[in-house]
Amino acid sequence: MSVQTTYSPVNQDEQVHDGLASRHVSCEGAPSDDSPYALSSLDHNPLGINVSFLLCFHAAQPEEGIRVLEDGINQLLKAHPFLAGDVTRPTRLSQRTNTMQIEPDAPESLLKIPMLQIRHHPATSIEELESKRLLPGAEEQEIIRQLAPLPIDMDLSLPQRPVLRFQANIMRDGVILAMTFHHAAMDGAGAARVLGLLADYCRDPAAPSVGVIPDRQLRSQIDRLATGCSPSASRADFSQHYCGLGDWAALLAENWPGFLQARATELVTWRLTIPGFKVQYLKGACNALLQGQTSALAGGTLTPTILSNNDIVSALMAMILRQAGQLAGKSTELSIAVDMRPSFHAPAFNNYLGNMVLLTYTPIPAAKDQAPVDGPRPPTELRQEDLEELTGIAARIRQSLLKVDAEYIQGVLSHLHSQTDWANIGFRGVPIPLSSFRNFEMIGLDFGETLGSQPRGFQLHLPVLGGMCFVLPKRQDRTEPWDLHLTLHRDDVSRIANDPLFRWAAGEHF
């Protein structure tokens, strides 16, 4: 992939400072907007890797589209200046160890890695990239190196790393806008919100940004809420779920580039599609069976009465992925990321950009042996025993989600806030982690006519770690297909591809 790199005027240091200066006026008597402030306890849960979201546009005039992006990013930084800052380690002593903070004013970092980079790929098309459904880890990492603004192998132990950067890639048939963010600074929903704000400013440079609550205020509010929570607010033992990565975390921090390089030869990324009509069939069949299974689900008021599409797809992927590698023939565990924003019942947190996620955990039983699918085409319906097991797993997933109420969230916040070493409060890893971006309306964003209005595609790129499953944002397609992004060991691809349940679900779409 041949490239040419240029830098946009939006990256100039004085322009970023203009955005910061506008915030000083409205914060009289408060700490200056360029002073560092602490990340919340929730920000210390995920591994602080770089994650990239890519939006693909069919722009007839890409150079004019770049100008629109420049103006939009300038407006975005005026509303949220911390996005141009860095995530750093505090130099002063505090009551906790291994904490992180945001340093909004980071001119040296901006000079080294501009806010918006522009790269030309005259020999590569969006269509060509989208056609690559199964990628070896090394090729996936090379694509990220070319298209993303921040290095995939940026050392995790660096004392200072950017919160967020953009790169506009001018392809042979359009523009790919890549946004890379530090996972300790925001979660997927926050990143999707940033792209939504950028779309507003690109479509209408005069879009108002009044009433924006400063990021530092919202992050500190989370920890104030945690301080007010009773340690006994929930009966759950959160130490089992928030125990960090232990020695593995130190290993990653010490040799992140080497770790990625080694994993790149072992893993593949797989983008596949489940037709919408199959998900609807499963939802109808499983909900019809649900009433007969409720007696097996202890929990009283937490017994689910209806299963959602997300419940069904999550259970389906758990049943498929339990066939991979060392999981085959064994019971395992599924984790699901849950956005807590709706539970706070505060409008300000609806637009919060930082981390606001917890994980639920669901046991997954070992798979039973199945006969291979005969013939070139899988059956149109699933076997009754498959439907019954799928219903049971989906119901337990829904049951775990129903436990996430106000009391449970208070217990999580209280537990995290009470810890003195925040390197040990990371999420506990499981063999099958799943995150759903299904309701992130990124494909429906309107960036204005210059960029071709709505993106025509979305891609997720992140370090190839293995064992991950993402449900991608819903496409603007009346058939409502379900797109997924998997990371597997290369030896597991054929095993999964020949699994009868996978063959039924994906069919000719993989």
From Swiss-Prot:
Record carries keyword Acyltransferase: yes
SUPFAM superfamilies associated with the record: CoA-dependent acyltransferases (SSF52777)
Pathway noted in the entry: Secondary metabolite biosynthesis; terpenoid biosynthesis
InterPro entries: CAT-like_dom_sf, Plant_Fungal_Acyltransferase, Tri101-like_N
Catalytic activity, EC: 2.3.1.-
Keyword terms: Acyltransferase, Transferase
Biotech and industrial use: Pyripyropene A and its derivatives have very unique characteristics of selectively inhibiting the acyl-coenzyme A:cholesterol acyltransferase 2 (ACAT2) isozyme. Therefore, pyripyropenes are expected to be developed as a new type of anti-atherosclerotic agent. Furthermore, pyripyropenes have been shown to exhibit anti-angiogenic activity against human umbilical vein endothelial cells. Finally, pyripyropene A also exhibits insecticidal properties.
Matching Pfam families: TRI-like_N
GO biological process, one term: terpenoid biosynthetic process
Leading EC class: transferase
Single annotated GO MF: acyltransferase activity, transferring groups other than amino-acyl groups
Keyword check for Transferase: yes
Domain of life: Eukaryota
Protein task: O-acetyltransferase; part of the gene cluster that mediates the biosynthesis of pyripyropene A, a specific human acyl-coenzyme A:cholesterol acyltransferase 2 inhibitor. The first step of the pathway is the synthesis of nicotinyl-CoA from nicotinic acid by the nicotinic acid-CoA ligase pyr1. Nicotinyl-CoA is then a substrate of polyketide synthase pyr2 to produce 4-hydroxy-6-(3-pyridinyl)-2H-pyran-2-one (HPPO) which is further prenylated by the polyprenyl transferase pyr6 to yield farnesyl-HPPO.
Homology family: Belongs to the fumigaclavine B O-acetyltransferase family.
Name of the protein in question: O-acetyltransferase pyr7
Organism: Aspergillus fumigatus (strain ATCC MYA-4609 / CBS 101355 / FGSC A1100 / Af293)
